[in-house]
């Protein structure tokens, strides 16, 4: 019954078991089936609208367009090496997304692109308490295969998360990507203000 309801809502949906990822058209949340990896490329219009960037620590080995001046690939383990400058982070989506967002927050000069799943632990632990601002993209993005060929529509809406003033300025000054800008008051600052007002 649940499978039928999801199929009816999603249209071209392929579900294999109750815990399997949902496939919508060409897009599959957990990996790019063509290459068997969690490697989907950021649409070039996003890079153009919010760039330029100094570093992309999640860059694919083969890429049809540049996302930053410097690229770290899976061989470099971008999560474990130092970051410099304004960072573009479209991390592998999955259980490690929170680790990438934690590093973005610690670096403090980063723009990250993830699914807008505000109920997740990654969002609760590394976005609301630490982000400077957010930009909820209107509609759903179409990511690309590493060949450069455009994939289907993403299985969830996306959000850009700014950590730091420069990344925030890029979101705030955007004029080409439709969506909703939101200045964030990190929850740790709210608690600090409450504590100070109680003293």
Question: What are these model-derived regions, one by one?
Answer:
Residues 2-199:
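Class I S-adenosyl-L-methionine-dependent methyltransferase catalytic core
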């Amino acid at each position: 019954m649940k499978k039928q309801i999801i199929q009816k809502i999603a249209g071209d949906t392929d579900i294999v078991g109750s815990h399997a990822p949902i496939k919508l058209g060409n897009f599959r949340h957990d990996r790019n089936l063509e290459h068997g990896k969690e490697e989907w490329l950021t649409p070039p219009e996003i890079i153009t609208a919010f760039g330029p960037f100094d570093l992309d620590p999640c860059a694919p080995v083969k890429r049809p367009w540049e996302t930053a001046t410097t690229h770290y690939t899976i061989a470099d383990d971008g999560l474990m090496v130092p970051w410099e400058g304004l960072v573009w982070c479209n991390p592998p989506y999955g259980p490690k997304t929170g680790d990438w967002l934690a590093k973005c927050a610690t670096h403090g000069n980063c723009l990250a692109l993830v699914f807008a799943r505000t109920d997740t632990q990654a969002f609760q632990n590394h976005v609301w308490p630490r982000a400077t601002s957010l930009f909820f993209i209107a509609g759903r993005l179409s990511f690309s295969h590493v060949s450069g060929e455009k994939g289907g529509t993403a299985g969830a809406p996306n959000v850009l998360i700014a950590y730091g003033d420069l990344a925030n300025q890029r979101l705030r000054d955007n004029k080409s990507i439709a969506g909703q800008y939101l200045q964030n008051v990190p929850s740790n600052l709210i608690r600090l203000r409450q504590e100070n007002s109680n003293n």
